Each structure stands twice: as structure tokens, then as C-alpha cells.
């Protein structure tokens, strides 16, 4: 039954990504501006202006797009990344940092997801276009070292799998408006 349930979700996610893959990233083009709020266990610790720039670079049907991230101003912190098609019909893209780092990203429904590990931290970045004028950017990060490990036992006839949980140390969120 669990396998049927998992297969059902896999099928649904593939259908959702196929439904939106045709309009991505064209319908996301523009400059998205707002305030990025940074939180930890004590609450909000920082706010900074943020811009996401998405613009077509070349004229091919499934070409590259700018995917620039600006924190504060271009003079303060500008990351001129590019969005590169891998298998757009399957929702697969790469964010190319233009420095030998290129990270797979996945478009599922209205969200572009990028999940990676760098310098001991697990990071999940999501970009969600909620309507034609609004994009929500979120980052969840924490150590790649498990906070706890439970399960890995047997209860009656059922094998209980091992489950590792990971700490969240920072949450970032920005509601961006198309300029």
C-alpha cells in the first residue's frame, strides 16, 4: 500500500511539473523586489532588501535565463547566476553560478526547488510564483549532521525504518513583487 501511495505522489508531481513547465521560465521574467527576513530560534534577526532578476539571455525556445540574486544593492551583494534548461519537460533545470558550481533545480507545480549541501550545511531554496505579481523566496538551512536518529527497530511484525532528523538553524523568507 505504501508503494502505491508513493507511486501516486510521484505521478501527481510529474503531472504538475508538466503542466507548468511550458510557461516556465517565460512567465517568471522580470525583476522581483522585496524584503528578505532572516529568522532563527530567537525570532527575526535581520532584514535586507532583495531582488531576483529573471530575463531571457538568448532566443532559443528553451534557452538560458539570467537568475540574478541581489541582496541590498548590486554593489553590496550581486550574484549573477543563470538558469539553464536540462530537461524542461520533466521540470529539470540548473542554476549555474558561473564559477564551476551548477546546482540541479526542479520545477514542481508553482515551485522551483534547489536542495544542496555546502560547507557542512544542508540548504533548501524555494521560489514560488503565487500569482502574476508575487514570488515567495524561502531558504531553510541547518547542519548536515543529524540531530537525532530514531526507529531502526521492530514492533511486532513491522520493521520500523531508521529516521534521522536534521536541525534547522536559519529560515529566510521574502515576498517579492514584480517591478
What are these regions (language model features)?
Residues 1-23:
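Bacterial Sec-dependent N-terminal signal peptides
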Residues 19-31, 45, 58, 126-131:
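N-terminal helix-cap/turn-to-beta initiation motif at the start of protein domains
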Residues 19-20, 51, 160:
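Short structured motifs
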Residues 28-36, 48-50, 174:
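One face of beta-strands
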Residues 30-32, 63-65, 133-139:
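A short hydrophobic beta-strand element
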Residues 33-39, 139-144:
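Generic short beta-strand segments
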Residues 42-124:
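Central antiparallel beta-sheet cores of small beta-barrel/beta-sandwich binding domains
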Residues 91-179:
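Beta-sheet ligand-binding and adhesion/scaffold domains
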